[in-house]
Amino acid sequence: MEVNTKKRVVIGLSGGVDSSVSALLLKQQGYEVIGLFMANWDTVANFENNRESDKKHQGCESELDYQDAQAVAQKIGIPLYRVEFIKEYWNNVFEYFLSEYQKNRTPNPDILCNQFIKFDSFLNYAKNELKADYIAMGHYAKVKHTNNLSYLLKATDVNKDQTYFLCNLKQTQLQNALFPIGDLTKQQVRTIAKEYGLVTANKKDSTGICFIGERNFKYFLENYIPNQPGEIVNIVNNQIVGHHMGTMYYTIGQRKGLNLGGMNERMFVCEKDINKKIIYVSPLSLEDQYLISNQALVENMNFIEPYNPQIPISVRFRHRQNLVVVNSFLCIENTNNVLINYEPAKAITPGQYAVFYQNDHCIGGGVIAQTNANHKKINF
C-alpha cells in the first residue's frame, strides 16, 4: 500500500480573501489542508454592553465570516473546524490592551493576537488535536526555513506587508509557519479568488480591533474603563481651553476630534498627565518641538534572529509607515531593552511597537517606553 507522505497544514480560515486564497494555494501545492476558524470574542461573556450604534456588530460579523469560511472550504474541498480561544484572548491580549490604556499608552493588540493566539493557542491546537505538520495564515509575509533558523522576510507587496505584526514571534512559532501569499500582491490575490469563484473575492479587508472588529472606540472602552473627565489645557499659556472624558481616548499628535472652538490656530495633543487627568494641547506651529524625537528606549525586545552590527538597521514605528534609519542600536546589559538613536521622526508614542529590519529581514521588535521628544531625558 502506498504511504501518504503529504504534509498536513492547518490554515487559519477567517472568512477573508487572504486566508481563502492561502488555503487554495496550499491545496494546489499538494498539502493536506484543514481549515480552522477561530471565534475569540464573546459579547455576552466579555460584558460588552454596546450602544445602539454598535448593535449591528453584536456577534453578527463573526457568524457571517464563519459562513464565508464554510463556503470557501466547501468550494476548495477541505474540512473546516471551529474553535474558540475566548479565555486565552481575554487573558493574554485584551487585559494587556486595557492595562496599557490605563497607563496612558497606545497598545497594538494585533501583535499580541499573533504572538498568543494565532501562533500559540492555534498552533498548539493544530499540532495536538489535528496533528498538523505546519500551520498557515493569510499574512502578507515570507518565511525562510533553514536547518538552524527560520527567517521572517518582508512580503512582495510592500503596501500590505504585515511583518510588523509578527515581530514578537519566537523561533519555535515561526519554524512551524507558512505564509502562502507572501509572494503575491493584493490585486493578484483577489484575481485568483475571482478566477476560482471564491465568495470572498470582493470582500473588504477587516478593520478594527483584532478578533473584535469595528466598534465605536469610546463606547467600547467605556465597558471596561470608567470615564475620567478632565481639562484640556493649552501648554503654551496654561489656560483651560476645553474638557474631555478620559485621557485614554486621545493619542499624542492627535489633531481631529478635540472639539476646541474659537482657537486662533489648529491644536494638537502634545502631552497627557494621567494623574492630573489633563490633556495638554499646543498650536500646530510648535509641532516639531513637542513631537519630533531621535532617541527611544525600547523594552521587552524580542529577537527573531540575531542582530548583525555589520548590516544597516532601520525601524518601523507604525504599520505601513516608512522605515526610519537607525544610527545606533545599543543592547542594555542584563535586560531585554535597547536604546536606539534614529533619524528625526514625529509622534513616536510609548506603548507602540518599534520593529526592526535589516535588508528584507524582520529581526524583531519591542515596546517603546520613552522618547526624547520635547528634550526629555531618557532614563534606564
Curated annotation (Swiss-Prot):
One of its GO terms (cellular component) is cytoplasm. Residues 108-110 are annotated as: Interaction with target base in tRNA. InterPro entries: MnmA-like, MnmA-like_C, MnmA-like_central, MnmA-like_central_sf, Rossmann-like_a/b/a_fold. This is tRNA-specific 2-thiouridylase MnmA. It comes from the Bacteria. One of its GO terms (biological process) is tRNA wobble position uridine thiolation. Residues 160-162 are annotated as: Interaction with tRNA. Pfam families: tRNA_Me_trans, tRNA_Me_trans_C, tRNA_Me_trans_M. It comes from Ureaplasma urealyticum serovar 10 (strain ATCC 33699 / Western). Gene3D superfamilies: Adenine nucleotide alpha hydrolases-like domains, HUPs, Translation factors. Catalyzes the 2-thiolation of uridine at the wobble position (U34) of tRNA, leading to the formation of s(2)U34. It catalyses: S-sulfanyl-L-cysteinyl-[protein] + uridine(34) in tRNA + AH2 + ATP = 2-thiouridine(34) in tRNA + L-cysteinyl-[protein] + A + AMP + diphosphate + H(+). Belongs to the MnmA/TRMU family. The gene is mnmA. The keyword Electron transport does not apply. It is found in: Cytoplasm. Keywords: ATP-binding, Cytoplasm, Disulfide bond, Nucleotide-binding, RNA-binding, Transferase, tRNA processing, tRNA-binding. The active site is at 113 (nucleophile), 210 (cysteine persulfide intermediate). Its main location: cytoplasm. Disulfide bonds join 113-210.
